Amino acid sequence: MNFLSDFQAGLGIALQFDNLLYCFAGVALGTVIGMLPGIGALSTISMLLPLTFYMEPTGAIIMLAGIFYGAQYGGSTASILMNIPGTATNAVTCLDGYPMAKNGRAGVALGMTTIVSFIGGSFSILLLMFLAPLIADVAISFQAPEYFAVILFGLVAASTMASGSVVKGLAMVTVGIVLGLVGLDLNTGVPRFQFGFVEMSDGLSIVALAMGLFGVAEILYNLMNTDGSPFKVQDVTMRSLMPTRQDVKTATAPTIRGMIIGAACGILPGTGATIASFLSYATEKRLSRHPEKFGTGIIEGIAAPEAANNASVQSAFIPTLSLGIPGDAVMAVMLGALMIHGIAPGPALVTQQPELFWGLIMSFWIGNLFLLLLNLPLIGLFVRILKIPYDALYIAMLVFICLGVYSIRNNVFDIFVVVFFGIVGVAMILGRYPAAPLLLGFLLGPMLEENMRRALLVSRGDFSIFVHG
């Protein structure tokens, strides 16, 4: 009965006009952003964080989440039509999506990716509905030592499973933890790592850090590697989007396997949608009777990875909401957004603020339905967005970032922080240092320190409490 009452309350919140508007705006913007190679959901969410300060918390989180999973839908469009992934998670879709487009089946490829994305996302929303409350019920009894262990596991997993060197991942986590300790020690009042800057007394801004590392860095890197001209793309009509009965039959099993793989990867910290899509593609190729056909434009090659990456995106909310442990960089920014709005993520969110939790889940259902309705009839309109000159788009985004970060505290120092971390972010991209573990370390580092201090206070300095509890 409690489940039904929470379900009804959440549906009522999600169906409020303001929240419907925020949900629609989020998924529509996410779709557009996903189509534009090099921008991505992470930088967009980072840029829009200042805007959400003036919004009601539930609506703000609904909109930001809509951008995240909406970008997965849009990312496949660029992969199929231009052989350029709109987001990293859609990279594997290029392998068979673009050959399908060259074979005259671009419409079928786009239609199929939209349908399987909806199925994969819906599957993970069901998991979120049932698993997150169960995990939260267990985690509500956690004390400081258990929280320390869970946070430490999340940091280590994120660093070791990140793309590239494990050593680089661990190094970035360490740097993130150190950056998270900047400012006054809350227990002693002693300033730490301020280097004489009074503006750093309250610590570094999560918005400035995220905007610099993921917004400015990506824009600068893309400006360095493109000429700013718009892409040449095929036109797509509504009639060409419908797959045949044989296409649906062929794609059914790969879609089921893909959404299961994606949901599992989303729950595990550090894996995420990119690994899920590649793993599902590799699985289908291994199980296929004709593996040599992969890469030539077959429906299985797009159905499995698209179902996987959308399932992964939705299931990534399970550890973030129920434990307060983000699995990737986007979830870390979402965690920061919750904190900015005074919402403590973790088991208390699920058990003590069920209206927010269930309202968010119900908005996922509505958002997925919006995406299905948007991406099928309006795909021809969305494709035209790819013809926007990139140099003008990027310059406008840089101005928006600076105005946004300044508006938070009316402090010019934050703009310098954004610029500094933007340059650092470009250097990290060139050196292949993953930025996501750094952001995770920045967010979770203070939580790790606080729970370690509490545990040692209870045990009177005995470190064995972390082993025996």
Q: How should these model regions be labeled?
A:
Residues 68-80, 86, 298-323, 327, ...:
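A structural-propensity feature for long, helix-poor, extended segments
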Residues 33-42, 80-91, 123-127, 265-274, ...:
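Short helix-coil transition sites and intra-membrane helix breaks within transmembrane domains
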Residues 27-41, 71-83, 158-163, 259-269, ...:
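Transmembrane alpha-helix interface/packing and boundary motifs in multi-pass membrane proteins
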Residues 41-51, 64, 79-99, 130, ...:
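Re-entrant/interfacial helical elements at transmembrane boundaries that shape
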Residues 58-62, 99-116, 288-302, 322-325, ...:
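Membrane-interface alpha-helices at helix entry/exit sites of multi-pass transporters
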